[in-house]
Amino acid sequence: MSQQDAVAALSERLLVAAYKGQTENVVQLINKGARVAVTKHGRTPLHLAANKGHLPVVQILLKAGCDLDVQDDGDQTALHRATVVGNTEIIAALIHEGCALDRQDKDGNTALHEASWHGFSQSAKLLIKAGANVLAKNKAGNTALHLACQNSHSQSTRVLLLAGSRADLKNNAGDTCLHVAARYNHLSIIRLLLTAFCSVHEKNQAGDTALHVAAALNHKKVAKILLEAGADTTIVNNAGQTPLETARYHNNPEVALLLTKAPQVLRFSRGRSLRKKRERLKEERRAQSVPRDEVAQSKGSVSAGDTPSSEQAVARKEEAREEFLSASPEPRAKDDRRRKSRPKVSAFSDPTPPADQQPGHQKNLHAHNHPKKRNRHRCSSPPPPHEFRAYQLYTLYRGKDGKVMQAPINGCRCEPLINKLENQLEATVEEIKAELGSVQDKMNTKLGQMENKTQHQMRVLDKLMVERLSAERTECLNRLQQHSDTEKHEGEKRQISLVDELKTWCMLKIQNLEQKLSGDSRACRAKSTPSTCESSTGVDQLVVTAGPAAASDSSPPVVRPKEKALNSTATQRLQQELSSSDCTGSRLRNVKVQTALLPMNEAARSDQQAGPCVNRGTQTKKSGKSGPTRHRAQQPAASSTCGQPPPATGSEQTGPHIRDTSQALELTQYFFEAVSTQMEKWYERKIEEARSQANQKAQQDKATLKEHIKSLEEELAKLRTRVQKEN
């Protein structure tokens, strides 16, 4: 057996010894090295010894250094376990060692809660003196005073109130201690709370006061005490019920009757002296002192000496008694409390006023003081008025059977009942009027609320419609802007594509012209004599390319034959090609005619300015490239003319060729200028057309938007008229 197993066995034995209170075994096990073990519920030996009340074991464990505030599975400490059983000695020992007083278990209860719940006032007193929190609440929001009031522990309640606990604190349901005591019908606790100036008008979360709770649970004595303490019977709960209506709803007639007489109870509860009691009793006896025959009549006996004068005396006496009772209601309340033969009054009907009650029946109740007679009258109700045999002054008449009948002179005995019914009818009429007034007020308030609600809805609808219209307007404007932007971009793209196509077409035409010109020159070279082939090839290289042969002046230029014929044929072909194009105008034709009729001196002047014209007039890459090459080709010729005079044949051959190229370049320049002007005009026309189309489309969209806005405004007006008609 290992050392750990031995220590575990010793710890288990320590638990058993602490549970059984075996002091010697506990000491031996601690000396042997037993450690603190726990049960399946998480309780230490200190928990077990404190719960079982083994004070020596607790003292030994405390001296051994056991932890005081260890909590079990229910989060209870040893102080909780000792407080549950009310062992004051162990509680005092734990407090002396410095245990935590306000440690809460899983339900939020402290040791003071446990002492108050179980009613251990001495334990509560020890905890309070040690500094326990009197106002601590558990998870349900209950203080220790709530728990003491719930279980009717008056001594613990008194201790807590003296310690400073507040009776008006509410739990999570909104109940005060007075609510709890009224719910569980604890009269002594209610009296204690009322002496501590507890408020009787506090409401819980349902809006109920303590009087509502007593009325709902049929606690008549509690309701009476609360009424004597000044509870308001007109307070309404969340269901809109007063305590009287609550008692009627729960079918509690006794409490309902008590609440209907609440002003009488309040007057009855005021302080009275014996002298006033005796004076009132004497006055009541004097009012009840009647002749013997009237006393007999009041007892319900039938005598032959009944006369109308005695009946009138009884009526006068009853009127005097009613006046006295209305002046002093306390004997009336006393009589109501004493008599038990009174028929039960429903809680749903109004109490009968004293003036409407039958005088004979009241006399019977006051005159019969014998218990047997009271028991006899308790079960039997008074006979109807017509069943009395009345011997008085009467008039004789014969009935249908011919028998002699008698009728009273002073009227029927049903008059009190009729008067009572009339009074009840008037009371019901007043109640109905009051209810109608309250219903009318409620209807007015509801109608006002509905009107405010409809106005608010109308304002919301107006705002929504305005926002919707503005959103649609902005959306339409955005769409128009996007549409115009897209059309503009498409027009620009079309223009760019047309410009590119025109450029490519022009380039193709220029290339074709150059190819034809180069082909004609090659044909002329082929027709020339073999003696001039080398010079003609040198001249072609100088004119066409700017190679290394242009820099060398070894081979002199040779003039080609038939240069005039070539010049005329080249100009005719160029004019035919340019005239065959579809995009040239009248200006281009005039330019061609003028260039064809230029004199020779202007051609020579243009030959000198061929280089600048090429650099300035060309707008394509091909013409831009051909200008410098031709300019470079012309430089050696100029230098040769400036250096040494060339032969006559060379000057005659190079002159026409240079004039042809300069004329072709000038023609292409004029051609591109005409094309560019025509393209600019075409661009302007297209832009104007696109702008006009966009403006027309914007006008159309604007008109449609205005029509849509008008339709929406008409719908809004229809909605407003419909809502007004519904209201």
UniProtKB/Swiss-Prot annotation:
Residues 277-386, 548-586, 601-657 are annotated as: Disordered. Keywords: ANK repeat, Coiled coil, Repeat. One of its GO terms (cellular component) is nucleus. ANK repeats lie at residues 9-38, 41-70, 74-103, 107-136, 140-169, 173-202, 206-235, 239-268. Residues 298-312, 566-584 have a biased composition (Polar residues). The keyword Protein biosynthesis does not apply. Gene3D superfamilies: Ankyrin repeat-containing domain (1.25.40.20). SMART domains: ANK. GO terms for molecular function: chloroplast targeting sequence binding. Residues 280-296, 314-324 have a biased composition (Basic and acidic residues). Pfam families: Ank (PF00023), Ank_2 (PF12796), Ank_4 (PF13637). Recruits CKI-epsilon to the beta-catenin degradation complex that consists of AXN1 or AXN2 and GSK3-beta and allows efficient phosphorylation of beta-catenin, thereby inhibiting beta-catenin/Tcf signals. This is Ankyrin repeat domain-containing protein 6. It comes from Homo sapiens.
